[in-house]
Amino acid sequence: MKYVAYSREDETFSEFLDQLKKQGPDVSLVSAQFSDLDDTRCRLVLDCLLDLWGQVASQPSMYGRSMPGVRYLDFSSNHIQSFQASGLVQILNNNRLLSALEIQANELGKAGTEDIRAFACAMKHCSLRRLNITANRLGDAGLATFIDHLPDTGTSLLALHLSVNTFSTDTGSWKAAHSIARFLSSPKKCRGLKSIHLNGNHFGWEGVRAIAHAISGSRRACEATASSLVDLPPSILDAC
């Protein structure tokens, strides 16, 4: 398994791109953490990866053998603001190779709810098993938009990380909490999901209660870590 990582201390951004191209389609993990990646630079990296994925897709008999393709992508702790401008939406289109996408601690959400909606809708075209959007700036409306526009028939996700994405308001993140509750109540939309991480969001007691009811009422084995869901008093699950 080949691993390619970008370090600003050891190489320039151009050298990193050249290294990716030279390694070819046998690279399986790419990391560019704490690299000051903005939308433009992220797009340049992803354009390079699209070419590598295309090389693997042109020879399907080589999947997992001499040309595994990039399966794990980590762009954590950067300055990415837009799912579309950065190329994150485009890389999901018919991508059956990428299985883990780590984009926590960026600035995603700044481009607005339509940008978030485009990313959520693109989830039906890929085979992602793990998606980490922790500590971005989706906000209440943005988080609700993401959840509401995930495909009705479900995704391939096993783990979904959405912690620390909403901000304290007078009413709490009520819209996001109810969208999450509806999502967890749908056997189709959350099919296959093993864990969803929601801690650090400002759902308020009413929001937490709605999510807790959805979890307790669902027959799916879904492990959840959510704000205030540790050691919940039994009364929180009482009928409304």
Q: Model-predicted segments: where are they?
A:
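Leucine-rich tandem repeat or coiled-coil scaffolds
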Residues: 1-240
